[in-house]
Amino acid sequence: MFLMEKLLERVNYILEALPYITQYSGKTVVIKYGGAAMAKADLKESFAKDIVLLKYVGIHPVIVHGGGPEINRLLDNLKIPTEFVHGHRVTDNQTMEIVEMVLTGKVNKQIVSLINSQGGKAVGISGKDGNLAKATKAPIEIELEGKEKQLFDVGLVGKIESVNPEILHNLQKAGFIPVISPVAENSEGESLNINADTFAGEIAGALKAEKLILLTDTQGILIDNQLVTGLNRNKVKDYIRKGEISGGMIPKVECCLTAIDQGVRRTHIIDGRVSHSILIEIFTDQGIGSLIES
């Protein structure tokens, strides 16, 4: 009897997913992959299995990835000094060569191989391939003590100006899973390093994705150390204004707002340290992390 109860419990888990499979089949979900989920072997495997399962039930995942720790490791090994200004890496020509080599040549291909090893058909590209994205240099705004805010040039760091999703549509139609490295060109043909969260938001908007999911190393958006499970634009802006959303969480929530402005229905900031967090978010009634919607 106990065995039968356990089997029925498993069946109920599958049945819980059924309405969500029906709802999202044929739809695009953009996932920003980074943090601990990229570093730990068990989490990497669970991520790859999640992505392959999504594809097999008719959902179209598109992956945008980071890779900061790998970049730092190679720069250290090559004894290339790294300068940061207010948390932003100053990226000269030499550093950009390393960034592109690591992101597009190493990390991207590792993710492709990981997904393919679980039965998927992943293809790795960057923003430069198929004219996917065009970018422009993006100086940062800093405030020095006793002075007004001013722009500071951090080198070959960019923001997305436009996205042409044709290559992604073609890959999806052919049954492939696009894996995108956050490197794009400007009008002068220079390679620029793009914040992966920001890039994911722009990709989601261009594809009119059903969902944007950001994997992070936190439960979601925490206010007074409590997880906030649901927010809208006004609430996010209010938390930023009060300083309750700050630091590295700001570009994450802002990319969610950008995606929403471009037609993405739901955006999620979830804990990538939790095994199978993507499946928990998409296929369970409770979900996981923080939801931001219009």
From Swiss-Prot:
Its EC number is 2.7.2.8. It is found in: Cytoplasm. GO terms for biological process: arginine biosynthetic process via ornithine; L-arginine biosynthetic process. It is an enzyme of class 2 (transferase). CDD domains: AAK_NAGK-C (cd04250). Pathway: Amino-acid biosynthesis; L-arginine biosynthesis; N(2)-acetyl-L-ornithine from L-glutamate: step 2/4. Coiled coil: none annotated. The record marks 32, 252 as: Transition state stabilizer. Its main location: cytoplasm. Substrate binds at residues 67-68, 89, 193. Belongs to the acetylglutamate kinase family. ArgB subfamily. Catalyzes the ATP-dependent phosphorylation of N-acetyl-L-glutamate. This is Acetylglutamate kinase. It comes from Leptospira interrogans serogroup Icterohaemorrhagiae serovar Lai (strain 56601).
